């Protein structure tokens, strides 16, 4: 943190004990969202394209009040799909957590235990967002594993569920802006 090459305000939040990865990420993002309306989230092993910062800054501002949009991907695993697009992004239901941005309004609805999962038409939700049967089966297993589990081993399936349950779209760049 001391070697940052740009001027910025730095907040350091230290924990007195190891709470585990899932709870640490949630607590850390709760803290960040208590101070900021929109956040770019990246992990320590990710490299972002220099243009990703402008991409996120522009879109986090442009769509901050648009509740149809819940997530900004920085990954595009199929850039050939968007070959010839004139825009720098498109809307998708695919939520990628390898570098992303979102808003406080979305993070406040995130719940590690996913209590809504047991109360909805699960097959209907999965059919809406997953076209392949194998994908639906795999994601259902992961959602079942994390639903009402106060000791989950990951945080990201709950985030995907949060976005899908709220029927939000993700902004996806036409070219990949993040390497994991």
Where does each model-flagged region fall?
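An acidic/histidine-cluster motif and surrounding catalytic segment
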Residues: 1-41, 46-180
């Amino acid at each position: 943190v001391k070697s940052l090459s740009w001027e910025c305000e730095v907040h350091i939040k230290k924990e007195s004990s190891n709470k585990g990865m899932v709870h640490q990420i949630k607590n850390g993002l709760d803290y960040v969202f208590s101070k900021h309306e929109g956040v770019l989230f990246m992990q320590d092993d990710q490299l972002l394209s220099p243009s990703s910062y402008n991409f996120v800054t522009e879109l986090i501002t442009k769509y901050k009040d648009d509740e149809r949009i819940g997530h900004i991907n920085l990954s595009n695993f199929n850039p050939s799909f968007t070959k010839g697009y004139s825009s720098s992004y498109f809307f998708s239901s695919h939520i990628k957590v390898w570098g992303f941005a979102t808003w406080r309004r979305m993070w406040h609805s995130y719940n590690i235990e996913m209590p809504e999962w047991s109360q909805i038409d699960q097959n209907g939700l999965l059919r809406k967002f997953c076209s392949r049967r194998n994908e639906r089966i795999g994601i259902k297993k992961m959602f079942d594993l994390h639903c009402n589990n106060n000791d989950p081993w990951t945080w990201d399936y709950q985030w995907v569920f949060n976005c899908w349950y709220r029927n939000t779209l993700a902004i996806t760049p036409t070219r990949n802006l993040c390497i994991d």
